[in-house]
Amino acid sequence: MAILVSPSNNTGWGLGCKSMYGGARRLTEHHPVLVRRHFRASWGSKRGRTTVPTVPITDDPVADVVNAIAEGTTRRRRRAERRRRRRQATSAMRAARALVRSARRRLARRGRVRRTRNPVADVVRAVEEATRANPPRRSARIRARTVATVNPLGPRNIYWVRDQSGKRIPVTSRPSRALGYLV
């Protein structure tokens, strides 16, 4: 945290992270001075921001107490209204979060070693899976989805084409029908 020299009456921005930024990450006419990597307001621009208590004083002590309590609650309510509220999550956001959680669970599950009552069989199975020459075949839909996500241009059609060895592979550019590759 950068501690800046603040004005003599301490109304300035140099005492903490929240107030130090002054709400400005960009240069404006209100925040003309660059400090480290953010802009702060010029000298004296934050003067007069504090509110004076407006509790009316009466002869009745009960009314004074009621007024003082009411003033505190309204100030607290105003402060709560000024606070930034968290946006209500839409159904799409909730679905995206659920998708991320399930993907994380799947990744964690994949790393776990399956255990049975026979520890020797567990070790043998783990070694076999680690040294298997052909990894387990992924489904065609997962392969196609992977190809689609790698492409930064957005969603595109996926065509299945046979390569030289005769295996079907997903491609995003449509081959010519005259060549007879499309299967």
From Swiss-Prot:
List of residues that carry Phosphoserine: 165
Propeptide residue range(s): 2-23
GO BP: symbiont entry into host cell; viral penetration into host nucleus
Domain of life: Viruses
Motif, Nuclear localization signal: chain positions: 168-183
Annotated GO CC locations: host cell; host cell nucleolus; viral capsid
UniProt keyword annotations, A-Z: DNA-binding, Host nucleus, Host-virus interaction, Late protein, Phosphoprotein, Viral penetration into host nucleus, Virion, Virus entry into host cell
PTM field: Cleaved near the N-terminus by the viral protease during virion maturation to form the mature protein.
Pfam families in the cross-refs: Adeno_VII (PF03228)
GO MF: DNA binding
Site (Cleavage) residue list: 23-24
Induction (free text): Expressed in the late phase of the viral replicative cycle.
Other noteworthy facts: All late proteins expressed from the major late promoter are produced by alternative splicing and alternative polyadenylation of the same gene giving rise to non-overlapping ORFs. A leader sequence is present in the N-terminus of all these mRNAs and is recognized by the viral shutoff protein to provide expression although conventional translation via ribosome scanning from the cap has been shut off in the host cell.
Subunit structure: Interacts with the core-capsid bridging protein; this interaction bridges the virus core to the capsid. Interacts with host NPM1; this interaction might play a role in placing the pre-histone-like nucleoprotein on the viral DNA or regulating viral gene expression. Interacts with host HMGB1; this interaction inhibits host immune response.
Function, as annotated: Plays a role in the inhibition of host immune response within the nucleus. Interacts with cellular nucleosomes and immobilizes the host immune danger signal HMGB1 on chromatin. In turn, prevents HMGB1 release out of the cell and thus decreases inflammation. Also plays a role in the wrapping and condensation of the viral DNA. May also promote viral genome import into the nucleus.
Family: Belongs to the adenoviridae histone-like nucleoprotein family.
Name of this protein: Pre-histone-like nucleoprotein
Gene that this sequence comes from: L2
